[in-house]
Amino acid sequence: MENSQTGVLCPNRCQVCSHTTYIRESSGQGGRQACRFTRFVTQPRVVSEQGIQYRSWLSDRGFPATLLSTSGGLSTTIRGHGVAVTIQGDSKSLLNFCRVAYDVFHHPVVQSEVCHGSGPATSDEITTKF
């Protein structure tokens, strides 16, 4: 699952609009945040409605990519195409987290509503616990 060259987990790329979501694992200790993948360390922008930290940029292939950080695997929210997914569990649930993220961002209903729809992006939230 981990790409040793880029240090990202589970890239999720939409086949319609080429938007890619990368998952980064991070944890906080004593008021400091330690990032597992230092290549993407940046001052994150906070999404007010969800409190999610992320960074967007154009990748080397020219498609938009978004990096979203987890909170040590205890409570994680990912967001892409206007859909938010919250996963709660221990750090050993990372495999399940990646699987759920992949399933959600590649689900035909999500793709049709968010990528094919003519209206504004949805703000549906899906929550699961492990």
UniProtKB/Swiss-Prot annotation:
Keyword RNA-binding in annotation: yes
Keywords: Host-virus interaction, Inhibition of host innate immune response by virus, RNA-binding, Suppressor of RNA silencing, Viral immunoevasion
GO biological process: symbiont-mediated suppression of host innate immune response
GO molecular function: RNA binding
Keyword RNA-binding: yes
Function (record text): Acts as a suppressor of RNA-mediated gene silencing, also known as post-transcriptional gene silencing (PTGS), a mechanism of plant viral defense that limits the accumulation of viral RNAs. Binds to dsRNAs without size specificity.
Protein name: RNA silencing suppressor p14
Organism, scientific name: Pothos latent virus (isolate Pigeonpea/India) (PoLV)
